[in-house]
A protein has these predicted regions:
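Short amphipathic alpha-helices and their capping/turn segments at secondary-structure boundaries
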Residues: 1-11, 39-48
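N-terminal small/glycine-rich loop or linker at the start of catalytic domains
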Residues: 7-31, 91, 115, 145-148
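Active-site beta->alpha loop and helix N-cap motifs at the rims of alpha/beta catalytic domains
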Residues: 47, 53, 58-150
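Short glycine-/small-residue-rich flexible loop motifs, especially phosphate/cofactor-binding loops
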Residues: 19, 43, 136
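Glycine-rich anion/phosphate-binding loops
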Residues: 31-41, 124-131
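A short N-terminal beta->alpha junction/helix N-cap motif
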Residues: 27-34, 68-72
Length: 150
């Protein structure tokens, strides 16, 4: 790490980004049953706060998870995200998480040009890293920013 990237504890570091995962992480507690009003309010609050990325939830397979038992943010359909953000004409980027083995990523993750999503975060365990790499490569080819959570 070069000296030009060093900072003090409280200095501004443009290379550090803030991602709010309230919906995705909180959805594990309430089965993703957030109202559109709550999601929209959180979206607007994150914009005002200068958050870099807002994670809306998962890209989970509707073949593996019952849509009647989970709220829409378990699946993050494009139309549902757009209902909240429109074309997202803000500096904040939109993120979703996809778990290895729990999403049909080739079908459920659209080409970036057809989506308001900017970042796909792939969650994996050590033993499923090869499958995670396949998912990351697919998302990258589709035009997304990508990260991996191990």
């Amino acid at each position: 790490m070069g000296r030009d990237r060093q900072g003090t504890l409280v200095s501004y570091r443009p290379d550090i980004k803030v991602l709010d995962c309230t919906l995705r992480d909180g959805g594990l507690v309430n089965n993703f049953a957030f109202s559109d009003e709550f999601v929209r309010d959180l979206y607007l609050a994150n914009i005002k706060a200068g958050v870099d990325y807002m994670e809306f939830g998962y890209k989970a397979s509707k073949e593996l998870f019952d849509v009647n038992k989970f709220g829409k943010w378990k699946f993050c359909d494009e139309k549902d995200i757009r209902n909240i953000v429109g074309d997202n004409k803000t500096d904040m980027k939109i993120s979703v998480m996809a778990d290895v083995g729990r999403t049909d990523f080739k079908k459920d993750i659209l080409n970036r040009k057809d989506s308001v999503i900017d970042l796909v975060r792939v969650a994996t365990y050590i033993n499923t890293i090869p499958a995670a790499i396949e998912m990351l490569e697919d998302a990258k080819k589709k035009g997304y920013e990508t990260t991996v959570n191990i």
